[in-house]
């Protein structure tokens, strides 16, 4: 009986594998999706948001680590900016409780910032404060 059950299970597995080989390709993926997203064009929401930054730091969607490239802004001022959002414009940062020195620093680097609508994919949890990248 065990031998018969073993043979039947093997035959069922083999038949399933053979059926998978003869199925038309439309069963596996929608042709419209395959044509729409061919090659490296597949992107998710976070990738699109990052591409919209145009090389600038997005004040609504960037972590504090992105401010390291601006001397004097990381970590104190970067933390204030990240926690103070969301912003409608870059100049909204000036409404934060910043010292005169911090306001001067922000004015110095102002052209390096942009504002896009907040994305849940980039703002979930505390990833903007601690994105888990350690040296």
Swiss-Prot record:
Compartment(s) of residence: Cellular thylakoid membrane
GO BP annotation list: photosynthesis; photosystem II stabilization
Signal peptide, first to last residue: 1-29
Main localization, broad class: membrane
Cellular component terms per the entry's GO annotation: extrinsic component of membrane; photosystem II oxygen evolving complex; plasma membrane-derived thylakoid membrane
Membrane topology: Peripheral membrane protein
Keywords: Electron transport, Membrane, Photosynthesis, Photosystem II, Signal, Thylakoid, Transport
Matches recorded under SUPFAM superfamilies: PsbU/PolX domain-like
UniProt subunit comment: PSII is composed of 1 copy each of membrane proteins PsbA, PsbB, PsbC, PsbD, PsbE, PsbF, PsbH, PsbI, PsbJ, PsbK, PsbL, PsbM, PsbT, PsbX, PsbY, PsbZ, Psb30/Ycf12, peripheral proteins PsbO, CyanoQ (PsbQ), PsbU, PsbV and a large number of cofactors. It forms dimeric complexes.
Role: One of the extrinsic, lumenal subunits of photosystem II (PSII). PSII is a light-driven water plastoquinone oxidoreductase, using light energy to abstract electrons from H(2)O, generating a proton gradient subsequently used for ATP formation. The extrinsic proteins stabilize the structure of photosystem II oxygen-evolving complex (OEC), the ion environment of oxygen evolution and protect the OEC against heat-induced inactivation.
Family label: Belongs to the PsbU family.
Name of this protein: Photosystem II extrinsic protein U
The species this protein was found in: Synechococcus sp. (strain CC9605)
């Amino acid at each position: 009986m065990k031998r018969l059950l073993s043979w039947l299970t093997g035959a069922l597995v083999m038949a399933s594998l053979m059926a998978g080989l003869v199925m038309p390709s439309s069963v596996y993926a929608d042709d419209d999706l395959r044509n729409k997203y061919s090659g490296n064009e597949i992107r998710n929401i976070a990738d699109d948001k990052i591409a919209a930054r145009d090389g600038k730091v997005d004040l609504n969607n960037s972590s504090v680590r992105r401010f390291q490239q601006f001397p004097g802004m990381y970590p104190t001022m970067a933390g204030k900016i990240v926690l103070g959002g969301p912003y409608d414009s870059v100049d909204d940062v000036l409404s934060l409780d910043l010292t005169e020195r911090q306001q001067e620093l922000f004015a110095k680097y102002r052209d390096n910032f942009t504002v896009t609508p907040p994305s849940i994919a980039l703002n979930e949890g505390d990833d903007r404060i601690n994105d888990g990248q350690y040296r």
